[in-house]
Amino acid sequence: MKTIYILSIGKLYRGKNGLYFINKDKKKSPIPLESIKEIFILNKVSVTYNALKLLADRNIPIHFFYENTKKGISYYLGSFLPRQKTKSGLVLVKQVEAYKDIEKRTEIALEIVDAIRYNCIKVLEKYHIDEVKELRKIDVWKMFEESLNDWKDAINIIRGIESNIWNLFYQGLDKILKLYKLERRTRRPPKNEANTIVSFANTLLYGVTLTEIYKTHLDPTISFLHELRDTRYSLALDLSENFKPIITFRILIWLVNQGIIKDTHFVKGLNGVLLNEQGKKLVIKEFNKRLDETIKLKSGLKRSMRWYIKAQAYNLERFLLDGRKFKAFRLIY
């Protein structure tokens, strides 16, 4: 099973023998529905009603992204999610209750943030830089307890701890990146080459996480670390966060330090920097490789990174249903 990425302008429609994509040059390509997990549409593509119905019948999500190269703007637009056949009223009730219960919500959010910290260390530790020592000193739970005076401030305190972790991580990254530097994290639009690689890879990771959540009974609109948003499935933001260091930022380090990605792979707009089609293909290739990479952990499991994304979602579901401790994914060999 694979992911389809559509990078060209065109039309997605249902033909006599299945689903097809036709580009602006009238070149027609069949899309084999029996072998795909999801579709990412990364350009201006019209999708017919019959195509959507066919995808809905096969439970195949589509993720849409908007881009304006002149302005240098690119962002997630929305997703088409077929009716969730695994929907559970009980899980929905439990998820809402956990969101409203500040102590439970805090427990989930702290676990995610500590997993972010741990995975940031795993990415940086072989470079022997000071930021690794600083990240190891951070005790997420202790910092939270020492800062908490009122439970209504709990989530903002956790986000502050998370922000400190990411800032240390970014400082460390800039020491090891050979060419393009983050300098500081910028979004919508990303202001430089490193940031645009990160933003693009993060949108892919968000889409994959949403696809995997869709396979569970969880409601993707109800989150714990991120605030609920009308424009995004915020649980996918929560559950992708601790995978960013080991997927997104390893992609950045590899493409930059191996000299794979170059100035010719970027487009500079009025407000920011974007990847051109060839640049996107390089990121997608490395992203797929990271997702399919099998990792054997201390538990003895040898599974793909995509599998661990789904397993984390199921882990959260079990916590909501029967109170088994929620464990966010950590890269523990």
UniProtKB/Swiss-Prot annotation:
<keyword id="KW-0540">Nuclease</keyword>
<feature type="binding site">
    <location>
        <position position="241"/>
    </location>
    <ligand>
        <name>Mn(2+)</name>
    </ligand>
</feature>
<dbReference type="InterPro" id="IPR042206">
    <property type="entry name" value="CRISPR-assoc_Cas1_C"/>
</dbReference>
<keyword id="KW-0238">DNA-binding</keyword>
<protein>
    <recommendedName>
        <fullName>CRISPR-associated endonuclease Cas1</fullName>
        <ecNumber>3.1.-.-</ecNumber>
    </recommendedName>
</protein>
<feature type="binding site">
    <location>
        <position position="162"/>
    </location>
    <ligand>
        <name>Mn(2+)</name>
    </ligand>
</feature>
<feature type="binding site">
    <location>
        <position position="226"/>
    </location>
    <ligand>
        <name>Mn(2+)</name>
    </ligand>
</feature>
<dbReference type="GO" id="GO:0004520">
    <property type="term" value="F:DNA endonuclease activity"/>
</dbReference>
<keyword id="KW-0378">Hydrolase</keyword>
<dbReference type="InterPro" id="IPR042211">
    <property type="entry name" value="CRISPR-assoc_Cas1_N"/>
</dbReference>
<keyword id="KW-0460">Magnesium</keyword>
<dbReference type="GO" id="GO:0043571">
    <property type="term" value="P:maintenance of CRISPR repeat elements"/>
</dbReference>
<dbReference type="InterPro" id="IPR002729">
    <property type="entry name" value="CRISPR-assoc_Cas1"/>
</dbReference>
<dbReference type="GO" id="GO:0046872">
    <property type="term" value="F:metal ion binding"/>
</dbReference>
<keyword id="KW-0464">Manganese</keyword>
<dbReference type="GO" id="GO:0003677">
    <property type="term" value="F:DNA binding"/>
</dbReference>
<comment type="subunit">
    <text>Homodimer, forms a heterotetramer with a Cas2 homodimer.</text>
</comment>
<comment type="similarity">
    <text>Belongs to the CRISPR-associated endonuclease Cas1 family.</text>
</comment>
<dbReference type="Pfam" id="PF01867">
    <property type="entry name" value="Cas_Cas1"/>
</dbReference>
<comment type="function">
    <text>CRISPR (clustered regularly interspaced short palindromic repeat), is an adaptive immune system that provides protection against mobile genetic elements (viruses, transposable elements and conjugative plasmids). CRISPR clusters contain spacers, sequences complementary to antecedent mobile elements, and target invading nucleic acids. CRISPR clusters are transcribed and processed into CRISPR RNA (crRNA). Acts as a dsDNA endonuclease. Involved in the integration of spacer DNA into the CRISPR cassette.</text>
</comment>
<keyword id="KW-0479">Metal-binding</keyword>
<dbReference type="InterPro" id="IPR019858">
    <property type="entry name" value="CRISPR-assoc_Cas1_HMARI/TNEAP"/>
</dbReference>
<keyword id="KW-0051">Antiviral defense</keyword>
<dbReference type="GO" id="GO:0051607">
    <property type="term" value="P:defense response to virus"/>
</dbReference>
<keyword id="KW-0255">Endonuclease</keyword>
